[in-house]
C-alpha cells in the first residue's frame, strides 16, 4: 500500500518547514519517506525533493515566455501537470510501500477557485491507488487578528470540502506564541476548536455596522458545518511532530494492511 499526504495552506504558513520536520522525524523512526515538490516557484529545500515539478515545468520560464503574472503562471503550471499526468505516474511508479509528503504551493485559488488540487487528489487516490490525505496549516499569528483567523477557518473549510479527502488542520508556529500576552490554555483552546462567538465579541465593535449581518452569517456557517478544528504544531518539539504524524497515520490507516516483514537472514534459512 502506498500513502500520500498533501501539505496545503496559505503562503508563509510554514509548509516547507513542516515537511522537513516530518521527514526528519520519520527517518528517526525508520520509516521510508519521500518529499514531492509541487511548487514550480520553489527555490530551496532542507531535503532535496525525490520528485520535483520543476523537472517538468518551471514558473519562471512560463512567466518569461508567456508573459504571465505569478498567479496565472502557477495555474498554467498546474494545468500543464494535469495534462501530463503520465509524467507523474512514471515518477511515482518505483515507490511501493512508501510514504510521500507532497509540498503544495501556497496559492489557495488552486483548490478554492479552480479544481486543480482536487483533481490531483482524485488521481492519486483512484487512478494510482494511494491512500491520500491532506494537512492544512495556518499561522498561529492569526490569533492576533480575529477577522484574519476566521478567514483562515473559512479557507480551511473550503479546502476540506473541495479536496474531498480526510484532512487535518494544524495551527503552525506554536513555539512563537508560548507565554505571549499571558494567553491561558483556555484562551488558546478557543482558537484550536474555533469558538464562533470570538468573531462577534470584537469584530462588530471594530467594523462598520453594515457588516454585522455578514459576521453573523459567517458564525452560523461555522457553527452549522462544525468541521474545522486545529491541532497545535511546534516543529521544535519532537513530541508535537510525532503527535501530528500519529493523527495523519490514523486518518490513512497507515500500516493496517501491511504484512509482517521477515528479516533477510531468516529468509535464507541459515541459523549457524
Curated annotation (Swiss-Prot):
The UniProt entry annotates the motif Gly-Pro-Asn (GPN)-loop at 69-71
Region described as Disordered: 253-272
A GO MF term = GTP binding
Residues recorded as binding GTP, renumbered to this chain, are 12-17, 172-175
Q: Name one Pfam family in it.
A: ATP_bind_1
Listed A to Z, the keywords are: GTP-binding, Hydrolase, Nucleotide-binding
Which GO biological-process labels does this protein carry?
A: mitotic sister chromatid cohesion; protein import into nucleus
Residues marked Stabilizes the phosphate intermediate (site): 71
Question: InterPro entries from the xrefs?
Answer: Gpn, Gpn3, P-loop_NTPase
Query: What is the purpose of this protein?
Result: Small GTPase required for proper nuclear import of RNA polymerase II and III (RNAPII and RNAPIII). May act at an RNAP assembly step prior to nuclear import.
How does this chain assemble?
Heterodimers with GPN1 or GPN2. Binds to RNA polymerase II (RNAPII).
PANTHER family to which the protein is assigned, alphabetical: GPN-LOOP GTPASE 3 (PTHR21231:SF7), XPA-BINDING PROTEIN 1-RELATED (PTHR21231)
Into which family does the record put it? Answer: Belongs to the GPN-loop GTPase family.
Query: What name does this protein carry?
Result: GPN-loop GTPase 3
Amino acid at each position: 500500500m502506498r500513502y500520500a499526504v498533501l501539505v496545503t495552506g496559505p503562503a508563509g504558513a510554514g509548509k516547507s518547514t513542516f515537511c522537513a520536520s516530518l521527514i526528519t522525524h520519520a527517518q528517526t523512526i525508520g520509516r521510508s519517506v519521500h518529499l514531492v515538490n509541487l511548487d514550480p516557484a520553489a527555490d530551496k529545500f532542507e531535503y532535496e525533493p525525490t520528485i520535483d515539478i520543476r523537472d517538468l515545468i518551471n514558473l519562471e520560464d512560463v512567466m518569461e515566455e508567456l508573459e504571465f503574472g505569478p498567479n496565472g503562471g502557477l495555474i498554467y503550471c498546474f494545468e500543464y501537470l494535469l495534462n501530463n499526468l503520465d509524467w507523474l505516474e512514471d515518477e511515482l511508479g518505483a515507490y511501493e510501500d512508501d510514504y510521500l509528503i507532497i509540498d503544495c504551493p501556497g496559492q489557495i485559488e488552486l483548490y478554492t477557485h479552480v479544481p486543480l488540487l482536487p483533481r490531483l487528489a482524485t488521481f492519486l487516490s483512484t487512478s494510482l491507488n494511494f491512500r491520500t490525505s491532506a494537512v492544512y496549516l495556518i499561522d498561529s499569528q492569526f490569533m492576533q487578528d480575529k477577522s484574519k483567523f476566521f478567514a483562515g477557518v473559512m479557507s480551511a473549510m473550503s479546502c476540506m470540502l473541495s479536496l474531498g479527502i480526510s484532512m487535518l488542520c494544524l495551527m503552525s508556529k506554536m513555539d512563537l506564541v508560548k507565554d505571549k500576552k499571558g494567553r491561558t490554555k483556555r484562551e488558546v483552546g478557543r482558537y484550536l476548536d474555533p469558538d464562533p462567538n470570538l468573531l462577534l465579541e470584537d469584530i462588530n465593535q471594530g467594523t462598520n455596522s453594515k457588516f454585522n449581518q455578514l459576521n453573523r452569517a459567517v458564525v452560523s456557517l461555522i457553527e452549522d458545518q462544525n468541521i474545522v478544528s486545529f491541532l497545535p504544531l511546534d516543529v521544535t518539539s519532537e513530541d508535537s511532530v510525532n503527535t501530528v504524524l500519529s493523527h495523519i497515520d490514523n486518518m490513512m490507516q497507515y500500516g493496517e494492511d501491511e504484512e509482517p516483514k521477515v528479516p533477510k537472514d531468516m529468509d535464507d534459512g541459515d541459523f549457524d
